[in-house]
């Protein structure tokens, strides 16, 4: 059984995202003074007094206004309500009761869900009680004064919500974390459309206007018994085109989404090809050591395709993204669904490689084979590089420590050869791998190896 879900709703700019962040103990949704910053619904996990639940943050609800995005936001909020077991209705204690609050309360009363009213921005204890008293008029039970900024009243709010939620079996609460998949790319390459295709519903706002996803949006899905957390991110632009403000925070959030992911889907527009910004983004993924799949979207829109078209595209992409040549390529159409069914299988393969642990004996067999095929070149003084021993010291990404006579003797060409040999023999498709080089004399290497093996055995 999944964790119980609580939908957080309210009109724009009452502090819903700040409250969700306070409940979850993180700053995930973008918090800014501009109304309407949260456009999609964002999920966070909360733990309180031994109980675990999820909260879903929604965009600001406004009825009677069909301007750009508001119908989409209402649709997303209603979808969140359909999943939820209870609702936290957030109002602004400083501003007091408004006609928009009353309209929302009327709508909530017609929904088949219990509602708890959270009167946010009540920083003072006594004053907060007075501010909250005005909201009894909504007829939704006792209003709970709280402050998302300072944290007061949050415990009381959770205590008011918990009785409305089903108990969850411990084994369900202890399920392993889902695979985190960040969907990144430039604005308007089809990231949200791809997410919706993978989820099977219109989950993120899809619009031809670049930049319509402002937050890193998490969606939990399951495929063949495996859970995934899909993270749709704001499109990443060049710094010179980014104004300080919400878009700045969105791009920063997208980079953080890469950091908290297991694997990244780098979405490229088939019609535009690989741009400089795609290269920079790919570099960021490699730098962070994340598994990656290159997803070439809008393949249906490429005209005059023949049997050579994919090969030509592949060659160009490999040339321009040579530093992540280990990432598999998928040519898809989020619009028609072409080849999107292959994405989860590729994700599983990449994650398995990213988490792979190779026995020390196997590492050294591969090393000896590599040395037999091609010895390290000697320097001008005739001194030749020697590799005494190797072992894997880390995963995510796989990292190997090599004991050598002098790291400076191993130039970039030979290091690339060694990585290629490891990939050919150990199958690291979809993940970067790292080599660390340590200088050791032949006399000392035996002792260092024994010490390293002991530390690895104790893990």
From Swiss-Prot:
Residues given in the record as GTP 2 binding sites: 185-192, 232-236, 297-300
Family affiliation: Belongs to the TRAFAC class TrmE-Era-EngA-EngB-Septin-like GTPase superfamily. EngA (Der) GTPase family.
GO biological process, one term: ribosome biogenesis
Keywords: GTP-binding, Nucleotide-binding, Repeat, Ribosome biogenesis
Domain EngA-type G: residue ranges: 4-169, 179-355
Protein name: GTPase Der
Pfam families for this protein: KH_dom-like, MMR_HSR1
UniProt function note: GTPase that plays an essential role in the late steps of ribosome biogenesis.
HAMAP family listed in its UniProt record: GTPase_Der
Residues binding GTP 1: 10-17, 57-61, 120-123
Gene symbol of the encoding locus: der
Record's subunit section: Associates with the 50S ribosomal subunit.
Gene Ontology MF: a single term: GTP binding
Gene3D superfamilies the UniProt entry points to: 3.30.300.20, P-loop containing nucleotide triphosphate hydrolases
Ranges of residues in domain KH-like: 356-441
InterPro entries given in the database record: G_ENGA, GTP-bd, GTPase_Der, KH_dom-like, KH_dom-like_a/b, P-loop_NTPase, Small_GTP-bd
Signal peptide: none
PANTHER family: GTPASE DER
